[in-house]
Every structure is written in C-alpha cells, then in structure tokens.
C-alpha cells in the first residue's frame, strides 16, 4: 500500500452534511428532468423543499446516492435528474423511485471518505472533440471544485464542464478510507456498493474513456499508478513456488518495478517498460508454473497462453496471422488509452520449437523465419506497444533466434535452475503442507533431512517423490492376494506417511540431472582393488582435484587426462573417483552409448551432456576412451575432425559463474592425442601403468580370494622364472584369474595365461 498525501490528519478537517435527527422515512417520487444546466453540471438531485431538506444525502432504490438541492421548479412528489444520472440508475421519465435520507457513516463506518477515485473521461459529443492536451492536475482541481463533499460510487455517470468543453465522466473504481489512518487499509473497489465522500485530499486519476479522444497530460504528482500492475494484497509466499527467491526478485526488479511507478517519473527517466521475459532452464524446475503464477499476482488482462507449435498452420500466411492476433487486443486498447491501458500478458511455452535461429531450417518454406520476423515486428517494431509483457519458456535457450534475445525483445532472461538445499526444503514444505495440516504425516519425517538427500532433484521430481511416498503409505492398507483386492478400513484412519515411505520413494524416483550410478558401477563391477601403492596415490590425487573443484574460487573447470595401456584400469579409477566425490551430477560419456549414431548425432549427444553439466552446482564428466569417440582407427589413419574440434572447445569452455565442473578423460592412445593437438586442453595428466611386479599380482590374488597361500607362492615362483619382464594390465589379470578358477589345475592354468598375456 502507498501512503496518500494529506491523510493521517484528524477527520475534523472535513465536515460532512449533518444527518442527525433526519427523517429516514421512504418516499415514493416520480423521475423528472433537472430544471436547468446548473443542476446538471452540479451532479445533484433537484427536489422540492416539501420533500427533503437542502444539501443532504439521499439514496434512491437503496443503491444510488445523491446530494439534494432545492428547486422551486420541481413539484412535490418528483425528483429531477440529468440524463447521465438517469442512465446510471436505469430510469425513464415519470418512473416511480424510492428515496430516503442516507447516513453514510452508519452504512460504511469510519471508512467513509475517498482515498482515491479513478475516472474515465470522454467528450460529450464526438463531433466537438479537440486535440488539446488536458492537464490531469487541472482536471482534478476542477472536479474537486464542482463536487467536493458529494458521495461517489463505481459505475456512476456524470457530466463536467472544463475550459469550455463538456465531458462525460464514469467512475471506474474507488478506495474508501478512514481519514485518521496513516495508510489505506482497504482495497480498490469496482462495485457500486462501495461509497465514499470526495475531499480535497482524494487522489483523482483520469483515464481515456470509451471514445479514446481525450488527450491527457501525465500528472506531475508523485502519486503511484492507480492501475498498479501488482495487486496490493499480493505476497510472494502466496504463489506456492519454492526455491526461487532470487529469481522472483530479479523478475520483479526488471519487469515490474517500473510499472508501479507514477507515469510522470517514468516519462522523466525517458525509459520504456520491459516487454519480454525469458525463463529458461532444465525441465521440471517450474518455468511454466512461474508464468502461470505471475498472471495471478498482476492486475492485468487474462493471460493468453500459447504452446509454441500451436502457432504453426498449414495455410500460407496463417502462422504469421496467429502471431498478429495475439497482439490485436493490446494494440486496440493502446490506441484508445495510451499509457493508461491495462497490461496484456502473452505466454509462449516451448519457445524454441517455433522461434529457431533464422536460416537454420531446411524445409525450404521460410515459414519459421517469417514467424520470427512477425514476432520481432510486434514486440519491437515501428508501432511500439508499452502495454504488453511476453513471457517465453524454453529448455534450450541456445536454439532461439539471437535477435529475440536483444534489448526491447526478451531482454530479461532468468535461468530457473535446479533448487539448492534451502530451495528443496521450501518445495517439500509446500508439497507436504496439506499432509501436515491434516495430520497425515508421521512425526519421524524430517523435511530438512529429505532436502539434503534429494540433491539435484527438480521441483517436479520432488512432487513425484512425495506422491511415491504417499503410494507406499497407501499400499500398507491394501491387501493384494490371489482373490479380490481388499481395503483395510481400520487402517485408513491410522494412515500416515512415514520416514520409511520417503526413503523407499528415493529408490523409486531418481533425478534426471543426478548420478549415472548404474553406468559408473558397471565400470567398477568387481570393486576397487588397492593392489599397489600407485593405485592409492592415483585415488588420492583424484580426491585432491575433487576438493579443488569444490572449494577453490579460481578453479571452476579442471580437466584431467588419465592415460595408460589398454586394460590398466583407467576407467575404473575415474569412476571410483567420481562416485566417492559426493557431487550431485555425474555423467559418463562412453563409446557404448554412441555406437551406431551418425556423426551429427554424436556431436549433439556430447554437446547436450556438457550443457547438462552446467545446470548443477557441482558436476563431474567422465569421458571414456577419447580416441574411440573421435572414430580414430590406425589404418589410414582416419578420425572425425568435427567431433574432435567440438571436444576441443567443450574441454576448454568454462561453466557459468556459480557452477563447477571436473572432467576426467581416459585414453589408451596418448601418442595419437599428441598428434591431434588436444593434450593442451587438459590441465593435468595422470598415468596409470600396468602391473609390473609379482607382488602386485599376489595382492590381486589375495583380494580376489584366489588359491591358498601355498598356491599363490607357487604361482609367483613359476612366473618369476617364466616372465622376468612381467607387464600385465589389471583387467586382463582379473579375467585370467576367473578363467583359472574354473580349471582343474588353477595354478598351472593361471601361470600359462599370465605368461601369454605378459
């Protein structure tokens, strides 16, 4: 609420008509015309001295209130109204009406004065319209001079003379207040039942009326806009959207703050309002929900919501026409009312599906380009509109035509990211509100614990988790047997969602931007074997790089190259480091997933994975077998230069300011990468050698629970004679051990297999 200048003073500074000891009996009167123009311009009811006292309030048909003025030209039993008054009441001449004295203070209590009044103004005769610009402050002074102390209600019609011109006025809305209050406590009302007395302190706002012909000069006062875009009773917590406090603050600052300021201030600043707001981010983070909720917090026209593909049509020119139709209402109102017109909101969902970069389509029709051109023309063309707000939503901001992202178009771009722990707690609080209010949630459920356990869950996934937990609780009351399914009615009364239900739901619902746990665990299927001090050293180095990415302010991106012979355990070590990191987002890019894809599909897959890695605060990417990803083969040799160049760029591209990324890349062809000139893309290198001494083999046999001590000693002794230059990878060693385990003579079988491998 805004403070209204002049209020907060004693109510004694205004004396209303004395209504004490007034005869309140109802009288039946006939409607007649007012005696002359002075009565018509004064907005009074002409009455006979025999019917009512002079200068009191009367109410007609228990709804319409006027101030009386005596006239000897009005016979007893009649009441004189001008044409505007008769239009407001819906009366015809000689019609019977009921009239009685009216005490506003008994009707409304202390809130009987007008804090503000909004008035539509039109020329009484269109043929006498002039292009003169009328000062709103002077109009307001004239209105007070003519009608001070009269009672006004929304929908009321009256006629006013100003500078020799006659105007029809219609009361749009009023705000009733108590003169003793510092600030208004009631909302702006548009219903006729709200009534108030006009005073010198009343804030009066004029707007172009139905003809749109009256040119109004912006008021020089610093009073706020009467048609403020933000509802006065709006609170952010009422939106029911959690985890987006910073985003809502930015949206309000950039898109709405200017719209609640007085037009005179905005005019002095020489700025225009923001017309476009782009919400982008991962799926399920609440972009569409925010757009819908923004419509509820605004005093605006009902938003027009359009899914991107709905714009397109098979008929020539229809797609462009669909765009024009979305702006038609806003254009018509802006022509009629100018800066005083209401805000029109247009919401585009899946913006990237239609407004792609011009020239990128291969259909040859040019329809997509024309649709982009049409939207650009409407948002920021020659005939600019200042009463629109276009809200676009997309998961792929990079696909949208760059011209749409410049100032004047979608200039406010807000990333709706995955919620942090505080945001997830807010979302859990919202999603379980009814559950808690109805005592359907067990006391052992700790929402803070659940928020900590649900790293990288989007708002939609948290909602799914709550539903899954509820299904586990419901399932306890249902007996599903061979016969009919039975519901235990006794258990329904005791139904509660417990901590165990939520923990079970965590296994049921996994985040889209979480850990590729299944793929990574496949890489270390047999567990991590610490057969050598070198393995311990590699894991410690990896943990150090993890800490660097997590804690250092200067290392948003760290790239590691893990190289060594094939089968030396590079992928397993990278997977182990990733799994032990505790990072919420871990992805594996493996040749297995890209097998069978075309070159362009591989590039798109790798690019999308890197982009996904920028959507979480802490991220790890494991790129397995880099030389295979670029399709390198020694015969020729040949490789995909497009994939190679894409990887070179991606490996060096730093994530956004508040995101961290650790990239671990494995290769068995170090010399090949050297020739490809990609080694400079990595910050550090970790060498993973084969097993080169028999003590390491002995440790592997012990951890694999293979043979007894005597058998292992025999294997080592045999290999020391047959393989003086022992050099075998851990992967091959484990395979040989499993093969020998199923032989009748495992000792000799393993010795033979290891000799062949060495």
UniProtKB/Swiss-Prot annotation:
It comes from the Eukaryota. The modification Phosphoserine is found at residue 226. GO terms for cellular component: cytosol; Golgi apparatus; Golgi stack; mating projection tip. It is found in: Cytoplasm. Pfam families: AAA (PF00004), AAA_lid_3 (PF17862), CDC48_2 (PF02933). ATP binds at residues 281-288, 564-571. The keyword Transport applies. InterPro entries: AAA+_ATPase, AAA_lid_3, Asp_de-COase-like_dom_sf, ATPase_AAA_core, ATPase_AAA_CS, Cdc48_dom2, CDC48_domain_2-like_sf, CDC4_N-term_subdom. PROSITE patterns: AAA (PS00674). GO terms for molecular function: ATP binding; ATP hydrolysis activity; phosphatidic acid binding; SNARE binding. Keywords: ATP-binding, Cytoplasm, ER-Golgi transport, Nucleotide-binding, Phosphoprotein, Protein transport, Repeat, Transport. Its main location: cytoplasm. GO terms for biological process: autophagosome assembly; endoplasmic reticulum to Golgi vesicle-mediated transport; Golgi to plasma membrane protein transport; inter-Golgi cisterna vesicle-mediated transport; intra-Golgi vesicle-mediated transport; macroautophagy; SNARE complex disassembly; vacuole fusion, non-autophagic. Belongs to the AAA ATPase family. Homohexamer. Binds to SEC17. Present with 5920 molecules/cell in log phase SD medium. Required for vesicle-mediated transport. Catalyzes the fusion of transport vesicles within the Golgi cisternae. Is also required for transport from the endoplasmic reticulum to the Golgi stack. Seems to function as a fusion protein required for the delivery of cargo proteins to all compartments of the Golgi stack independent of vesicle origin. This is Vesicular-fusion protein SEC18. It comes from Saccharomyces cerevisiae (strain ATCC 204508 / S288c). The gene is SEC18.
